[in-house]
């Protein structure tokens, strides 16, 4: 079973990758807020496989830290039920 760390884990820099890898994670989905330059730096700083969103919804919060959906709609984005309140 492959383990992937999605944006909900808030792994936004390569220094956090070893923690996820120690848990058995093989792929990290980087936050969609990162620029291309930041993604390049991330890739250079880890040997983990990276996945990048290139199109789609951009949260008003930092990926993985949204509380808007829960506050406005009673649906937790951090549990996969984002209401796209933004």
Model region roles, listed by residue range:
Residues 11-18:
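Short, acidic/polar
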Residues 33:
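Flexible loop residues that form catalytic
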Residues 1-11, 29-30, 38-86:
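Active-site pocket-lining/capping segments in soluble small-molecule metabolic enzymes
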Residues 24, 28:
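Acidic, glycine-enriched active-site microenvironments
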């Amino acid at each position: 079973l492959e383990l992937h760390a999605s944006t909900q884990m808030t792994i936004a820099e390569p220094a956090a990758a070893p923690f996820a890898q120690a848990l058995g994670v093989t792929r990290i989905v980087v936050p969609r807020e990162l620029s291309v330059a930041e993604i390049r730096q991330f890739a250079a700083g880890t040997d983990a496989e990276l996945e990048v969103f290139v199109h789609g919804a951009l949260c008003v919060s930092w990926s993985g830290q949204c509380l808007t959906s829960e506050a406005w709609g009673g649906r937790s984005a951090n549990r996969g039920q984002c209401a796209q309140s933004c």
